[in-house]
Amino acid sequence: MKSMRFSYSRVEAGQTTASELAYLPITLRTVNGSVERQGLLDTGSTVNVLPYTVGLALGFAWEQQTIPISLTGSLSKVPAYGVIVTGRVESFPTVELAFAWTQAADVPLILGQVNFFMEFEVCFFRSQAVFEVKPKASQK
């Protein structure tokens, strides 16, 4: 399957190109809901991170979660639980994505090493402010 190219996005209007980041449009689904969001591609993040409000929109109930996750860095003191959702990027095949669903609402949807970068090949062309994404080779 061919790759798709995306442009870097500015987080806030009026900022310089130095503040542009790699945000990827992605659709997340569960049996209880579906959302379209912009996920921050973060090669330095060990895990995918799902903000609290997005988890609620997908139909998750905090009190019913049973798989605690310990986050690191700026989220180290915030409780999180492991959840699985179906993810779709453009016309690529859907994949199961594991997220650390955090109670923090002020964090972006983060696509990290586990397991976004295990499901997709990503190539960054920062000097051109673009990046390419394609499904991993074994995915047809």
Predicted regions span which residues?
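Pepsin/retropepsin-fold aspartyl endopeptidases
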Residues: 1-140
